[in-house]
Amino acid sequence: MRLTVRLVDIAARGILLHHNDAKSLGVLAGDRIVISSPVTGKATVDYVETTGTLIDQGRIGVYHHTNEQLTLTENEVVEVRVADRPVSLDYIKKKMEGEKLTREDIRAIVADIVQDTLSPSEITAFVVSSYINQLDMDEIESLTRAMVETGDQLSFHAGPIVDKHSIGGVPGNKISLIVVPIIAASGLLIPKTSSRAITGAGGTADLMEVLAPVEFSASEVQEMTIKTGGVIVWGGATNIAPADDKIIIQEYPFKIDQIGQMIASVMAKKFAVGADVVAIDIPVGKYCKVHTIEEGKKLARQFIDLGERLNMRVECALTYGDAPVGRAIGPKLEIKEALSVLEGSDSPRSLIQKSCVIAGIALELAGKANRGEGANLALEILRSGKALKKFLDIIAVQGGTPDVSSEKITVGEHFYTVRADSTGYVIDLNNHSLITIARTAGAPADHGAGLYLHAKHGTSLSKGDPIFTIYADRKWRLEKAIEEARRLRPVMVEGMLIDRVPNVREWVPGRSRNLE
């Protein structure tokens, strides 16, 4: 069938057909068609949407994302035909039925995800089927390798190449801003690709973007790493393991965190950047992805097993996850706190200790320190000022201004301090609620938004003492965040007396006890 192009300014992928043309082709909404241009010779497969009013019969509406591949012009005539059904759908159905997928099955699924052959609903079917029928280690390895093969890779002549990762779930976990410069200052290479926040108040890429650009190609990442020893960039711009982002997008609405896919996601990125040694942070706590030490050890063994299959040395640290790391949550607040540590501040101790522990593991794995001595070496590098100098070098090589300090970072101009309404001790911090408040205040999109904790577990408070301060770039967002803070009450303060249980019976003076 020949149809005349009408370009539609919609960012999504897809094409729009009149009902009658769709009927003539024998397709329904959601089916695939092949569009080819006789002018350029380009062709692509995309999904059909139908209408009776938005497009005239004989015309085809081409969305922006689709036209990026075809470069069609308005009123150009194109050829349209029904596309073949992807064989990868059979493999997804196979997983739905509880069968084990082969390496070739998984390679076909991942290739179709990357090439946009599978629709979002079909990718969701793969995600859900892998969630219900868990991937085993063979499938996880196959998924990891397929993710790597379908994207760009880095290749360094010198080694060992170091990387680190945190599986997330803890607010304020800004340790990459300290770990990366410590590792790079030791003489090792660490090409750190990081994520943006999906449900959090700031991913590492969101934080680094306060100071420097974070979107680079894989070749640029490699070049900058060789020049300075390390980078902190957004992985989504590198085309490293591109299937991962497409899978994560489909996981998000269901709040699915499928363990096998998570392990493959992490390790694919590490393998693709050429990492020889990897330190993995697994926070453990009631508000974390991992709730118990036993669960954490099981997950760690899976990471280590996969590392051995991929010829990478992996070690995992089970870390305390029942409170934020440091006191700051939100891009500029966290950058300010990380810079203060790099500049020599002795607090917050949780941030310093965790950063040095993770950096220390990496230094030991890479042969820079004996076992058990890595954290001390990391602290020595931090205290010497070498890590700060290296961090400023990283900012510069990524196109930022290295003339920066913690004092120069300004946070949201609108703020409100939540205070204790009674005397007592902090007995609980709800990480989920703290993140919700920070996001309501505008983080991570508004870089100055977030919150700062004045009190953490065990802090003694008198009535009226500050518990945390909310910051926002916009007043209306601050007002919304205050409402959330009052509703959620994320910090629990209790005295030694939890409650009184009264005797509700009336007491009569002089009444004798019944001894019968």
Curated annotation (Swiss-Prot):
One of its GO terms (biological process) is AMP catabolic process. One of its GO terms (molecular function) is 1,4-alpha-oligoglucan phosphorylase activity. Pfam families: Glycos_trans_3N, Glycos_transf_3, PYNP_C. Its EC number is 2.4.2.57. The active site is at residue 257. Catalyzes the conversion of AMP and phosphate to adenine and ribose 1,5-bisphosphate (R15P). Exhibits phosphorylase activity toward CMP and UMP in addition to AMP. Functions in an archaeal AMP degradation pathway, together with R15P isomerase and RubisCO. Belongs to the thymidine/pyrimidine-nucleoside phosphorylase family. Type 2 subfamily. This is AMP phosphorylase. It comes from Methanospirillum hungatei JF-1 (strain ATCC 27890 / DSM 864 / NBRC 100397 / JF-1).
